Amino acid sequence: HLLDAPVIGLVFADPHAYLERYSEPDKAKTKLGDETSAWPTPYWTVDASFATMQLLLAAHDVGLGALFFGVFNGEDELRKEFKVPVQMQLIGAVAIGWPMLENLTDRGASAKRPRRKPSEIIREGSF
C-alpha cells in the first residue's frame, strides 16, 4: 500500500550548496569548497538524512504514518518529470499518509527477525 499514500515526497541533497558555502572567505581555508571529494563525510547527505528523520518523526507526532524508502529504479524519469537540477543527489523518498492497522502477517522478513541484544550493537571503548 506504499504507493497509495496521499503524499510521496522525494528527498534530495545539494552538494553544490556546500561547495559554495565552503568557498566563502570565512570557510575557504578548509579547502572543502574545492570539490566534493575533499569532504571525508558528505554532510549534504547527512543533513538531508537528518531532515528526513525529523519529517518522519513530525508526521508520527501528529498521528500520520510515514516511511522512508529507496528509489532504486526510475530515477532518470523522476528527474525529467520534476525538472531536477543535475547537481541534486537523490537520497530517497518519503511516503506520508494514515497508518494502517498493523497486521503481523503483512510484515516483511526483516521485521520478523528477533531484535539484536544491545550488547551486539553497542560498543564501549573499542570494537
Sequence positions of predicted segments:
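Glycine/small-residue-rich phosphate/adenosyl-binding loop
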Residues: 1-48
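Structural motif
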Residues: 6-8, 66, 89-93
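Short secondary-structure boundary segments
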Residues: 13, 71, 98
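C-terminal helix-cap and adjacent tail motif
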Residues: 27, 91-127
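GST superfamily/GST-like fold recognition
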Residues: 43, 62-77
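Short hydrophobic alpha-helices that are characteristic scaffold elements of the AMP-binding
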Residues: 57-61
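Short, conserved aromatic-histidine micro-motifs
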Residues: 78-96
